């Protein structure tokens, strides 16, 4: 069930409640935590106009939304773990029984499973990836390298938010992603991992940097070849994302592959 028709404060419910890792997590930014059993814990950090809302009013709204969802989807599908309002900042921590509950309640696409299962579900992994070393540095990796390890776990999300997983990150997609720890990433539009490596598919001897157009006279067909010899530089820190509105929507899928 996707919640809609939200104004002002209700953005906290509809635009995505961001996750933290476990009920004991204290996060200062929107974060989504995916546990090893597929349960989701979220922390949403929201700046409020205190002239409109206070802690009691906010709690009543959240409790009502949760009760409505659970009535339709089963008891304890979604639970409020903690809610505080201090100095104009609201922190809302919630528990979701399943990934599907998180997606249905927030309208934010989220997937968790093995790579082979994600492929069967229709995710194509058609993007640039980077390998994450023990020290947090990144290296080049191909899509084929990743798909060959189909039993690895993957979290796929379509949102601008921080994400933590219960495991060690091995690979991440490059667009809009910054690796912040062995088990965490930050997703913000305008940031990302700059691809400074060339994959095997892109490698071309220097004498062949430019391919000539070949024509086949008999068939009348023209075959054109194009070689990618570089990539555009990412804008990196030039773009700053305002997190005060919660997890904002995006058209980009972020892939986090781990064990």
Segments from the language model and where they lie:
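Bacterial signal peptide processing site
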Residues: 22-24
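C-terminal motif of bacterial Sec signal peptides marking the signal peptidase cleavage site
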Residues: 17-20
